[in-house]
Amino acid sequence: MPVFTASFQCVTLFGQPASAADAQPLLQGQRPFLHLHARRRRPCGPMLISKSPPYPASEETREWEAEGQHEHTDELRETTTTMIDGIRTALRSIGEGEISISAYDTSLVALLKRLDGGDGPQFPSTIDWIVQNQLPDGSWGDASFFMMGDRIMSTLACVVALKSWNIHTDKCERGLLFIQENMWRLAHEEEDWMLVGFEIALPSLLDMAKDLDLDIPYDEPALKAIYAERERKLAKIPRDVLHAMPTTLLHSLEGMVDLDWEKLLKLRCLDGSFHCSPASTATAFQQTGDQKCFEYLDGIVKKFNGGVPCIYPLDVYERLWAVDRLTRLGISRHFTSEIEDCLDYIFRNWTPDGLAHTKNCPVKDIDDTAMGFRLLRLYGYQVDPCVLKKFEKDGKFFCLHGESNPSSVTPMYNTYRASQLKFPGDDGVLGRAEVFCRSFLQDRRGSNRMKDKWAIAKDIPGEVEYAMDYPWKASLPRIETRLYLDQYGGSGDVWIGKVLHRMTLFCNDLYLKAAKADFSNFQKECRVELNGLRRWYLRSNLERFGGTDPQTTLMTSYFLASANIFEPNRAAERLGWARVALLADAVSSHFRRIGGPKNLTSNLEELISLVPFDDAYSGSLREAWKQWLMAWTAKESSQESIEGDTAILLVRAIEIFGGRHVLTGQRPDLWEYSQLEQLTSSICRKLYRRVLAQENGKSTEKVEEIDQQLDLEMQELTRRVLQGCSAINRLTRETFLHVVKSFCYVAYCSPETIDNHIDKVIFQDVI
């Protein structure tokens, strides 16, 4: 591991630190990047340190503490490893989707009569499931989240099934009592959480209940409103379209009448289902006796041991959301091969029309498509953004064709995240999607209408807030993860379909516990490293060479490094970044205080000796410092150009400490590498210019002009990093992106925000 030390005590080049009287006034625009907000920044270090666990000053105490913490950390890591292994096992056995059972769909399958003409159900195991899963209050439905629509639908369906076979009268009576006592509550249901096809399916169930003479309050005002809505929606359904092409209407055939089944059978999915709905497929089989429908139903009844889900399969959806959750929870690095398998599967099933929840469903949606596009592009696959045009109409974007309420929070949120991954030359649809989705989400956020029609998650408003406030170019991995640990609901997250359901592979407490343990390990390492960095800083006596707020610079330098490069085995790169940033700041501060570099060329070796590197990388490090220091002597040198040079210095230092750096003249990929350096330098210079334009009260048009230039260069850098030259190590390409995103983050965030993030990421324990 490369290690370096610095000692300024005996360096005559710097002389004595300038006194306040001797210091020359700073020219406008001559502040280092980390101090762009310095005049408004409150002290960061002491405030944060006081909130963190105490860091003993003496070596004896420190060693004693380190030993005890080491034992605790080893135990935590062992626990984390066990959980990671459990997740890995689940990912390796991923199939067509893990989903909870739907009492509603199971009941409709239970109504199917024996094919041989005998008495009783064709699938008796469905009856067994119904009998075994009645809840204590007499209802059926999701046991952990009470939604009246879900309970009424599920309970009524189960009662109809049991009554149809004249069995388990006691359970029927308890279910009926629940319905009688609670039907009125439907009028008070949350509109944003309406079950899919509820107003079509419930009246159909009620008609079946009437035929069975079930004692239900059919005249309840809430039901009259639902019947009226059913008639309104059925009147809007174009029957020619319904029978001619696959649409989402195929998902709710059990609630429709006067259907031409001969035509509809041509619209089945390849697996024999109607839009992957067991209830809809059961109705189709009841009406037609179609063998493929039977094979689909028989397969899922056996797979789920009697019960059936509300939708199946979900092979695409499950893989996408699992990768997304693991990435945002910060533990994706443990599952590189499993994630590669998932995304290879997605890429194989990618179509010009987009994606659906399963590979064989012809009805695509923007949610799966946007998530797929984003993840595939992030992981280096080549996908065309023109696919989003399939979900664009009249300047708006919708989730599914024919939706009565075309826009909901989570599909637009996922599309907004995807739209930010632009490459030069991409179709303008990404830009239009970004504008529309941002406006939509801003409107929902401003009016406090953040409930989603597809999911009931722990903190959707928090997820949207982060995406809106921190664009991808300024979002740092550990910040996103720390906030998402508070937003992710684990097993508490519920999904809305025909009934409420759970996606157990990617919404579970094991993910959450593993991620929290992993992050806790990271925090402990950060505190130890930060403590050591502080001691190194004091021993090196860097503070006496100026800087607006040395403690803040130290804290921010380390935070930016650790927020990007957080893996335990990359401590050398993390600390190398932080130390080089601190040294560069000290040198920059000194030069500004004495009016610029004097006799720099003749004393260059003496200045470089401030950072003696006694290892195999010393030559590369010395060359990197030499080039940075020489930039100060250039006639066209300005603080803006120095910022770009500092970004390159950081990149080179990180690469050197990661053991990946090759001297520029020896690189076989010289042109591609130089392009990455040029883009990095240019973006960071423009970010500095943008901040100054804002602080100096320049016009909005001027700032927007800089933003447009930044966006174009950021698109090019993103393309070169995500899909660039294979001769350049992926980690090397990502280093450029890490440094640029850290500069973006500082430019776009207030000092108070940065302070809060430092506190949250490093010092606030994950509970």
Curated annotation (Swiss-Prot):
It comes from the Eukaryota. InterPro entries: Isoprenoid_synthase_dom_sf, Terpene_synth_N, Terpene_synth_N_sf, Terpene_synthase-like, Terpenoid_cyclase/PrenylTrfase. GO terms for cellular component: chloroplast. Signal peptide: none annotated. Its cofactor is Mg(2+). GO terms for molecular function: magnesium ion binding; syn-copalyl diphosphate synthase activity; terpene synthase activity. Residues 59-74 have a biased composition (Basic and acidic residues). Induction: By UV irradiation. It catalyses: (2E,6E,10E)-geranylgeranyl diphosphate = 9alpha-copalyl diphosphate. GO terms for biological process: defense response; gibberellin biosynthetic process. A motif (DXDD motif) lies at residues 365-368. Residues 45-74 are annotated as: Disordered. It holds the Pfam family Terpene_synth. Mg(2+) binds at D365, D367. Keywords: Isomerase, Magnesium, Metal-binding, Plant defense. Substrate binds at K233, K453. The keyword Magnesium applies. Its EC number is 5.5.1.14. The Asp-Xaa-Asp-Asp (DXDD) motif is important for the catalytic activity, presumably through binding to Mg(2+). Phytoalexins are diterpenoid secondary metabolites involved in the defense mechanism of the plant and produced in response to attack (by a pathogen, elicitor or UV irradiation). Catalyzes the conversion of geranylgeranyl diphosphate to the phytoalexin precursor syn-copalyl diphosphate. PANTHER family: ENT-COPALYL DIPHOSPHATE SYNTHASE, CHLOROPLASTIC. This is Syn-copalyl diphosphate synthase. It comes from Oryza sativa subsp. indica.
